[in-house]
Structure formats: structure tokens, C-alpha cells
């Protein structure tokens, strides 16, 4: 035993076995489930040494029901798991779950070793080598708690008795399983697992979960919460069922789906602008779901080559549509800062393309473009063009979302705005931010497959298109080359496609939420003026010069709609309206003394800080930490340029080394190691960032 703060920590398997006698743990299952779970919260973590030629774990720390253990050799950890399997009579239908915060790291180090001892019977990957969970035949299951909290371990354990300790271990020190740990290092290891245990226990208590009912992800938690309201309302269930899409409609909808509009005025890029301001929508995505009309009823297919006049008529009559459109001879209007056609939404090559602006198409002789009727309204105001038709598409009626769906949204907004500091505040805020994601989930997703061998890890990926339509001949050999069995040789049937949508929120609601937010942002860009708009990102727009009184007219309409829909929150003697465009710095004439951007997700400013009453340098550069970005600018935003190089961009770069299992004898005891990840200081070079990001995974280790 070893002491860590107020804890007695086991250092051997017999010590753990003896202490487990003090814990009584039964099994639980879902009401309609057959699988049982040991009703204990368990957590796991490792610390590693890694070099250019070698990498291994030198600590294996875990917490079972509040009892912490730190072991130094993999074989001891394996024996500990075997003891737990025997003690709790685990098997494939009776499981014990261990949570790992950012499980991809531990997975890569240990999966070959674990598979050598036990059969991997189930796993779900969100990307190559990134499991949401993985399960063995002996009943041991690992889950990624990062997806459960959607925040770093430090933030997830805030307020816990044993929160993650400040700072990181010095990863440059070469440690082995035989290296004695200082008290500080030991405490660091312990807090990583006991703190996570406390955070999950808190989550279970707040939401009345047990180990069988706790969802895998935060989004799943939100879905369960909304379902408690929605599934009791048979009328709402019928509305959602009617919105199920057939295979052709689903493919068009997936192609039309897009995120936030993040872009900068190409005429203003690379220059520093004085005296700027910003508007920011209040809860942009949830506001659309509360205030706007959404797809309802059974969608119907439009005729082939539907004319633009007919498409416009749908909009005038209060309907919406999604389509693959052909646009003939189009060109961005002079002075328009926001080319609304993303190159990723064009099918095939844009014929006669006249130019790209940070991934946006400026014009062309002709192109097939996926868009919905909201994006069409942006397009027709942004471009000059000769003709447009819908080669294929479908339409639908619009109406307000059902009250049973809107109620959890407005309830969360009320708590977020009026009950800050209450126990429900953080969950309501997270729920409000996740409701869009709950609707925007593809029911047919990319599928990642991993085959674990003694020699290494083999990965493959099937796109949602391959799953829906069957693997095309052009891709068949690529899948065969992995050595894995080829799947999805035949397209899905309409019945199979319908089944994927049965228990999900309508995908059209997620699609419509984001496109309505893009349309509202477009309206604000027009109000502040094309010549003044600088940079915008999903729900905010930065612009040059004085504040725009015209925005007040826009907000008056939003406030009136809030009153109509019962979405007004009373906060003291004030009323709060969701969806209004708020002045980011209302107390002063100019919120930004200086503003400069290069492209999407790359800007710096001198923004007003009301706490200090002064302007302060700020930076947002994708792939660079906030502090490191500010330091690199050396007090001058003009240093944000295409030649910017940052020695220390914050976080670590991960370099994957695929290795066979080997038994090594360079430690006091023989031990097995396999593949590993090398952690390197992360640098940033503006000139090569895009190329490097395509070939090397850049991850902030939290």
C-alpha cells in the first residue's frame, strides 16, 4: 500500500483483492435488456515513455468502486483483470465497464496485448484507432469517457474532491516500470483515475443512472432526456415517423447537410482593420428550433429537372426542399464577401471554375451543387447566374416543431439564463448546445473497422455512401488490399434504410437547424453591409466601423416571434430573448481596436475586456493554443501572416508507430509491449499547416 493524499492505494493484485471484500456490488440491466453490468464505476489510465524507436506503458492505474490501484507491469494489470473476471463472474453477458478519458491513446498501446489474452467481441470506432468502446469475451469492457463529458479531464473533474492535478508529467523523462515515482508523480497518476471516478459517480447521481442505464455519450444523454418528453406524445411520434426518408432522399439530404458558415471577406484578408465591432446570436441553433418552421409531414419527390420558378414557388407557399441543382454560368457578384457555394457541396468537377476562395467557389461554366431552399436563398442573392434547375430533389411542408420537442429546449434556455450557479445550470447549458447534434446524426454513418493482430493493427473505412449504395468497383480493390473481408457489396434495401431511422430524431430537423442559422447569419451580413463585413463564424459576424442601428429592426422581429412562441425569459427586471443578434461589446463604441484575419479559423484582434477596461490581444488559430497564439504574435497582430511559425503551439503531436508484440528483457522483469504513440511538441507553420494536418494527426492532449 502507498498513501496518496487521503487515500490508501494498492500496489499489488493481492492488496486489491483483499480490499475488494469491503465492496458489495450487484449487477443491473436495462428494463428490456438481457445483458447485465456490475454496478460499480471503474476507471483506467496509463502513463507512457515514448521515443523515436521505442514506446511502452510504465504505470497502469485504475479505480474500482473508489479503490485505487497503481501497477507497473502489464502482466500485473492483466492478472488484476483476470482476478476481477473471476471475482464478479464476468462473461460476455455480464460485464464490468472501465472508463478511459480519451481511450484512443490507451487503446493503441494495449489492444494487441489484450487481444493476445482474450477475444475482442465488439467495438465501435468513431475514426481509425478511436474506439467509443471495445469489449472482450471475458466481460471486460472499456469506454471513452471523453465522449460522455465532451470536455477535458481537468474540466470534467472540476469540483471533485480529487480533481485532476494542475500541470502534466514531464514526458521527456525516460521512465520504465522500475523507475520509482515521486510523491507528486504518484498523486498525479492516482488523481487521474479517482477524479474521473468521482466525476462519473456525480453524473450518475445527478441523472439517476446506474451502470446499465448510463448512455455512451453526452449526445445520447440529451436524446434520452428529450425522448422522455417526446415519446409520450403519440402525435409527435407520428410526425417523426412521417419524416423518414427513402434511400434517394436520404442521400440528397446527407449531401445537402452542412455546418456553420465560417469565412472571411476575401477583399479584407491579410490586412489590419481599425475600430471594429461584432454581433453574436444568442443560442443560434436552439433559437431556430424554437422560433422557425421546420419540415413536417411525408416528403415527396420533385419531378426531374424541376425549374427554378417551381423551386421559388415552393418557398413562397411556405414549403422547403432539398435538391441536387445544376447551375449554369454563375459568378459571384462584385463586392459580395460570402461565396455561399462550398466546393465540398459540388458533385464532381466545377466546369470552367473561375476561382476558389478558401474552399468556396467563385464561379464557373456549370456545376451540380447540393443545397436546400435556405441555402438557395443565400445563393441567388450572392451570385449572378444564367439558369438553375433541380436535377433531383424532394420537398416538404413546414410547421413549428411539436411542443413536446420544444419544451425541453425552452426549459434548458430558462435555466441557462436565470439559474447560473445552480446544480442544473451546466447540464442545461450542455443540453442546449447538444440538441442540434442529436438531430444532425446520420443514421447511416461511416464505419471504421480495425483488425488486431500480433504484427500490428489493420484499419479500414466504409463511407456512408458505400454502405447505402454498395461498394463500387472502383473501391473494391482498396478494401481487398487491407486483407479484411469486404462488406457492403449490395445496396441497402428501402426497408433497411427505414429501419435505421426508426428511433432517431428526423435528420431533416438537424439539416434545417444549421441551414436556418446560415440564412440568419447571411441576413446580418447584409445588414452590416458587404463592404463592412470582415469575418463570420456560424453565429457571429465581425465588421468594420460603427454599430448598425438596422440590427435593432432585425431584433425587434425576433423579440416579437419570441413573445408569440412563449420563449421569453424573465431575468430580474429584464427580459431575455433567444435568437437576437447581441452586440458583443455594448458599453463602448468599438469592441475591437484592431482586427486581422487570414482565412477561416485564423484571426487575431485587440478586443475590449470589460473587467480590465482595456483592449487586450486575442488570437484564434486552428491548431494553436490561445496562450501560445498570443505569445507568438509578440504584442502585434500584424505578425499574423502567411509566414508565421510557432515553435510551441501548445499540446502534443501524436505520431503512431505500428509494431508487433515483443517480449522484452531490458527491465527487472520480462514484459510484453507492442504498438505505441510518440508524443512530440506541437509546432505550427502557416505555410505547411494544411499539408501537415492531412498527414499527421494533431491533437491537444487534455
List the model feature ranges, each with a label.
Residues 1-42, 46, 260:
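N-terminal accessory regions of nucleic-acid-interacting proteins
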Residues 46-47, 282:
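Activation of the activation-loop gatekeeper triad in protein kinase-fold domains
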Residues 34-37, 41, 52-100, 107-702:
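Conserved acidic
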Amino acid at each position: 500500500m502507498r498513501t496518496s493524499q487521503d487515500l490508501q492505494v494498492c500496489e499489488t493484485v493481492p492488496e486489491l483483492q483483499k480490499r475488494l471484500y469491503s465492496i458489495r456490488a450487484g449487477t443491473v440491466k436495462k428494463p428490456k435488456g438481457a445483458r447485465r453490468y456490475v454496478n460499480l464505476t471503474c476507471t483506467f489510465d496509463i502513463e507512457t515513455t515514448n521515443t523515436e524507436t521505442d514506446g511502452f506503458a510504465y504505470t497502469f492505474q485504475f479505480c474500482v468502486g473508489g479503490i485505487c490501484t497503481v501497477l507497473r507491469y502489464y502482466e500485473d494489470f492483466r492478472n488484476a483483470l483476470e482476478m476481477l473476471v473471476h471475482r464478479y463472474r464476468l462473461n460476455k453477458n455480464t460485464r464490468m465497464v472501465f472508463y478511459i478519458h480519451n481511450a484512443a491513446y490507451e487503446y493503441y498501446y494495449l489492444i494487441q496485448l489484450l487481444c493476445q489474452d482474450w477475444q475482442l467481441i465488439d467495438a465501435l470506432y468513431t475514426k481509425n484507432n478511436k474506439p467509443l468502446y471495445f469489449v472482450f469475451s471475458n466481460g471486460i469492457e472499456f469506454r471513452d469517457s471523453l465522449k460522455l463529458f465532451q470536455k477535458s479531464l481537468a474540466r470534467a473533474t472540476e469540483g471533485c474532491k480529487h480533481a485532476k492535478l494542475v500541470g502534466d508529467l514531464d514526458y521527456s523523462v525516460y521512465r520504465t516500470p522500475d523507475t520509482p515515482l515521486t510523491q507528486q508523480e504518484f498523486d498525479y497518476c492516482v488523481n487521474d483515475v479517482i477524479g474521473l471516478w468521482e466525476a462519473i459517480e456525480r453524473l450518475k447521481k445527478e441523472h439517476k443512472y446506474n451502470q446499465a442505464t448510463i448512455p455512451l455519450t453526452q449526445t445520447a444523454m440529451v436524446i434520452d432526456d428529450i425522448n422522455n418528453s417526446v415519446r409520450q406524445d403519440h402525435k409527435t411520434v407520428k410526425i417523426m415517423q412521417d419524416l423518414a426518408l427513402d434511400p434517394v432522399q436520404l442521400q440528397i439530404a446527407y449531401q445537402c447537410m452542412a455546418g456553420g458558415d465560417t469565412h472571411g471577406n476575401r477583399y479584407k484578408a491579410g490586412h489590419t482593420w481599425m475600430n471594429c465591432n461584432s454581433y453574436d446570436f444568442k443560442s443560434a441553433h436552439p433559437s431556430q428550433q424554437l422560433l422557425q418552421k421546420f419540415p413536417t409531414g411525408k416528403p415527396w419527390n420533385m419531378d426531374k429537372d424541376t425549374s427554378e420558378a417551381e423551386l421559388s414557388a415552393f418557398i413562397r407557399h411556405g414549403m422547403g426542399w432539398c435538391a441536387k441543382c445544376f447551375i449554369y454560368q454563375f459568378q459571384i457578384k462584385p463586392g459580395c464577401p460570402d461565396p455561399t457555394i462550398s466546393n465540398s457541396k459540388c458533385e464532381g468537377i466545377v466546369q470552367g471554375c473561375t476561382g476558389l476562395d478558401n474552399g468556396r467557389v467563385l464561379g464557373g461554366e456549370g456545376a451540380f451543387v447540393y443545397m436546400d431552399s435556405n441555402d438557395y436563398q443565400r445563393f441567388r442573392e450572392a451570385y449572378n447566374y444564367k439558369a438553375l434547375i433541380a436535377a433531383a430533389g424532394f420537398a416538404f411542408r413546414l410547421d413549428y416543431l411539436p411542443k413536446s420537442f420544444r419544451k425541453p429546449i425552452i426549459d434548458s434556455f430558462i435555466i441557462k439564463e436565470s439559474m447560473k450557479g445552480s446544480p442544473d445550470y451546466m447540464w442545461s447549458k450542455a443540453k442546449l448546445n447538444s440538441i442540434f447534434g442529436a438531430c444532425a446524426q446520420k443514421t447511416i454513418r461511416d464505419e471504421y473497422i480495425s483488425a488486431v493482430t500480433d504484427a500490428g493493427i489493420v484499419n479500414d473505412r466504409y463511407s456512408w455512401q458505400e454502405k447505402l449504395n454498395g461498394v463500387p468497383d472502383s473501391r473494391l480493390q482498396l478494401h481487398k488490399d487491407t486483407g479484411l473481408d469486404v462488406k457492403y457489396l449490395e445496396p441497402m434495401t428501402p426497408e433497411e434504410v427505414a429501419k435505421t431511422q426508426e428511433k432517431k430524431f428526423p435528420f431533416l430537423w438537424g439539416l434545417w437547424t444549421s441551414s436556418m442559422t446560415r440564412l440568419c447569419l447571411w441576413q446580418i451580413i447584409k445588414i452590416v453591409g458587404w463592404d463592412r463585413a470582415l469575418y463570420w463564424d456560424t453565429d457571429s459576424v465581425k465588421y468594420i466601423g460603427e454599430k448598425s442601428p438596422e440590427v435593432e429592426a432585425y431584433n425587434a422581429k425576433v423579440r416579437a416571434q419570441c413573445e408569440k412562441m412563449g420563449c421569453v425569459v424573465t431575468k430580474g427586471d429584464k427580459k431575455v430573448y433567444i435568437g437576437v443578434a447581441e452586440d458583443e461589446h455594448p458599453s463602448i463604441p468599438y469592441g475591437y481596436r484592431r482586427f486581422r484575419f487570414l482565412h477561416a479559423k485564423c484571426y487575431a484582434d485587440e478586443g475590449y475586456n470589460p473587467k480590465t477596461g482595456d483592449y487586450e490581444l486575442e488570437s484564434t488559430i486552428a491548431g494553436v493554443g490561445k496562450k501560445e497564439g498570443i505569445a507568438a504574435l509578440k504584442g502585434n497582430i500584424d505578425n499574423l501572416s502567411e509566414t508565421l511559425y510557432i515553435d510551441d503551439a501548445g499540446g502534443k503531436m501524436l505520431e503512431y508507430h505500428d509494431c508487433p508484440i515483443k517480449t522484452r528483457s531490458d527491465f527487472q522483469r520480462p514484459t510484453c509491449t507492442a504498438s505505441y504513440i510518440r508524443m512530440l511538441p506541437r509546432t505550427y507553420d502557416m505555410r505547411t499547416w494544411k499539408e501537415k494536418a492531412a498527414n499527421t494527426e494533431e491533437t491537444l492532449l487534455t
